């Protein structure tokens, strides 16, 4: 897996905080499930006031279909900041960029440029559309690095559940042309330098998974 140690160290710290905030709900059958990353925990207003936000930035187009991201960065720092693509979970079939908004805001408050992204879900487009969109998001950030004050050589990704799978695949498929897609900025690399995949599905071949 691609790894830049300084970015990964900070991302791991945020992953620990993220997991601590995922409180468990009791279920009648004894099951438990985490709360959404956009659940009841609030980002303090003073933290939000220190962030610059660009919402609904279009990063890819497929005919009349546009994909958007919400970009956050600290107001008191500009230029050559590491960037993080924040990918939402939802079983590849539901969710949106707002479900990772607080993770993106919390990371931005710690000195990153963050991009919480939408991507095509399985009801709209089959695999590999999801990962192609994630790669298009990375290429967009790299292509617009000067505008958003990003270090193009230090881009990472974070995701939980289905997004953990996409983040891991993003980190390990930089040289797989079939997964690049046609989301634009083809002259830029989709490689990332750090990744924190949390609880992602990685075994798609076992009998249990197929069932």
Enumerate the language-model features and the residues they cover.
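Short beta-to-alpha linker loops that shape the active-site pocket of alpha/beta-hydrolase fold enzymes
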Residues: 75, 90, 113, 118-122, ...
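Short amphipathic alpha-helix adjacent to the substrate-entry channel of hydrolases
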Residues: 96-116
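Conserved Rossmann-like nucleotide-binding pocket used by diverse enzymes
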Residues: 53, 113-115, 196
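Long, internal low-complexity/basic segments
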Residues: 2-38
């Amino acid at each position: 897996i691609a790894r830049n140690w300084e970015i990964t160290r900070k991302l791991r710290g945020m992953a620990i905080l993220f997991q601590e905030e995922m409180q468990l709900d009791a279920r009648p059958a004894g099951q438990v499930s985490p709360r959404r990353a956009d659940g009841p925990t609030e980002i303090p207003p003073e933290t939000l006031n220190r962030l610059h936000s660009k919402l609904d930035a279009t990063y890819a187009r497929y005919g009349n279909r546009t994909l958007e991201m919400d970009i956050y960065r600290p107001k008191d720092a500009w230029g050559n900041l590491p960037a993080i693509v924040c990918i939402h979970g939802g079983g590849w079939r539901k969710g949106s960029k707002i479900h990772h908004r607080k993770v993106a805001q919390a990371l931005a408050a710690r000195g990153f440029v963050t991009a919480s992204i939408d991507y095509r879900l399985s009801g709209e487009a089959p695999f590999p559309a999801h990962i192609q969109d994630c790669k298009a998001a990375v290429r967009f950030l790299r292509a617009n690095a000067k505008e958003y004050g990003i270090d193009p050589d230090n881009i990472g990704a974070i995701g939980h559940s289905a997004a953990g799978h996409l983040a891991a695949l993003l980190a390990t498929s930089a040289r797989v042309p079939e997964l690049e897609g046609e989301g634009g900025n083809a002259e830029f690399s989709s490689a990332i330098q750090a990744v924190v995949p949390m609880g992602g599905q990685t075994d798609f071949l076992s009998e249990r998974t197929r069932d």
